Every structure is written in C-alpha cells, then in structure tokens.
Design a protein with these regions (language model features):
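Membrane-helix interface linkers and caps
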Residues: 2-15, 43-100, 123, 216
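Hydrophobic alpha-helical transmembrane segments
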Residues: 23, 27, 59, 97-101, ...
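Alpha-helical transmembrane segments of multi-pass membrane proteins
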Residues: 32-43
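Juxtamembrane helix-loop-helix connectors linking adjacent transmembrane helices
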Residues: 45, 49, 84-150, 160-161, ...
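Hydrophobic alpha-helical segments embedded in the membrane of multi-pass proteins
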Residues: 134-141, 174-179, 195-211
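Membrane-interface helix/loop boundary segments of multi-pass membrane proteins
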Residues: 150-176, 210-213
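Membrane-interface helix caps and helix-loop-helix hairpins in membrane proteins
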Residues: 185-193
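Conserved small/polar residues in nucleotide/adenosyl-binding loops
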Residues: 243-244
C-alpha cells in the first residue's frame, strides 16, 4: 500500500515527523478545546446569558464542539508544525461536488429508513418525522455542520492520523481512534448498545475517510445523521436515536 498522499499517513509523512508530535497535537487539542469552551462560557455569562436551559444551552453545546476547529488548527500548525490542509484531505482529494451529493443521499436514506421504522414499527405519525424542527433550523443547520466538521477534524484528522503514525497500520489506527470518539459522547454510556453504536459510527466515518482520502464525505454523512436526529420526533428507542454531535 502506497503511503504517498494517503490521508491516514498524513502526519507520519511529514518531513519533520517525530513520534512525540502527534501526541503533542492531541494534548494541545484537548487543552485548547477545554480552554476555548471555558472562555465561551465565561463570555456568555458575563453577557448575562443563562446557558443552563433553552436555546442558549443548545447553542452553547454546539459551541463547545465547534471550538475544536480552532483547537485543531492551532495544534496542527504551531505544535505539529505541518500544513493544516493535512487534516482535511490527502492527495488526490475529493471533487468539490461529492460531499454535497453524499449529504443529500445520506439524508434521504436515513430519513426514509428511520421514518419507516418509526411510523410502522412504533406507531409514530408522518408529521413527527420533522416534529422537532424549529424556526431557528437554518441557524441550527449551520451549527450542526460546523460541529460535524469539528469532530471529523479532531478524531479523523488528529487522533486517527496519530494512531496510524504510531502503529503504521490503518486498521489498528482506526480501531484505536474509535475509543476517544466514544469517550467524548456521554450518550453512549447508558448501555452496551450505545457503545456499539458510537463505535460503529467511528468506523463508518473512518471508512468514508479511507474511500475518499479525506474527511469531507465523512463530514457530510455525519451532518446528515445529526440533522435527522435533531429534527425528528418519532419516539424511537434511545438505541435507534443516538447521534453523534
């Protein structure tokens, strides 16, 4: 298998690669994400915004994920000392239209399958398919997109590349990178089903990264799943509804 231009090996392929650089990137991302989230929370509190409930709570939650974008960019550029483009795509990359097509197809497939399960399996009505959609949906969709991008940058662009660099094996790297992905999603802690669900999510997104040599299609599918999970009100069991942002 050629490593030249391979997204999985983007960290190890750097001329200045050293074993400690991926570790330093990971630590920097974690510390910076916590720091940025704290700053965001304090700023909102100083502005008199109550982030414990309502829309403020929702968007603060999105913001605490979105700050990972800045954390990754800073860590990769100034700690890892590598091009920030290396956390987005290998070479050759994905054609620009492919992620948009992937989002549309994934959203249709997910919506149809889960709606059929909800309506015919659990007695929901068709109106409940978008029962949670609100007036702020366009804004929330942007937040969902940025959150999906943030997670793919962090877990596929940093963690996956780090574990692959250390093990020199993409499969082992993918399996190891799934662990922190599960750990940051407390929704998974309630049952073994939740853990399996998030583990499968991580492997699916990693497979998309492998096939398309970059994170953009994974971001699109990630966004599609989270979008449906946000707007639906089908009353499905938690094991069916877990989503990843």
């Amino acid at each position: 298998m050629s490593r030249t231009g391979n997204f999985f090996f983007a960290s190890r392929n750097q001329p200045n690669y050293a074993w400690w650089r991926p570790l330093a990137e990971i630590l920097a991302v974690v510390v910076l994400a916590v720091l940025f989230t704290g700053v965001l929370g304090l700023t909102l509190e100083a502005a008199g915004v109550d982030t414990s409930s309502g829309a403020a709570d929702k968007y603060f939650g999105y913001g605490s994920v979105i700050v990972e974008i800045l954390a990754v960019l800073v860590a990769v550029r100034f700690i890892g000392r590598r091009p920030v483009s290396s956390v987005f795509t290998g070479q050759p990359g994905t054609k620009p239209w492919v992620p948009f097509a992937a989002f549309a197809v994934a959203l249709v497939v997910i919506s149809v399958v889960m709606s059929l399960v909800g309506v015919y399996g659990y007695g929901a009505s068709w109106g409940q398919v978008v029962g949670n959609i609100g007036a702020d949906f366009p804004v929330e969709l942007v937040a969902l997109a940025l959150a999906a991008l943030a997670e793919e940058m962090a877990f596929r662009g940093v963690f996956l590349q780090a574990f692959t660099a250390w093990t020199r094996n993409p499969v082992i790297g993918a399996l190891l990178a799934a662990v922190p992905f599960i750990l940051v999603h407390p929704q998974a802690y309630g049952s073994p089903v939740g853990i399996v669900h998030y583990f499968a999510d991580a492997l699916l997104f990693t497979l998309l990264v492998w096939v398309f040599n970059g994170i953009w299609v994974a971001v699109a599918v990630h966004l599609a799943w989270n979008t449906f999970g946000t707007v639906q009100d089908l009353g499905l069991p938690v094991s069916c509804l877990l989503y990843t942002s």
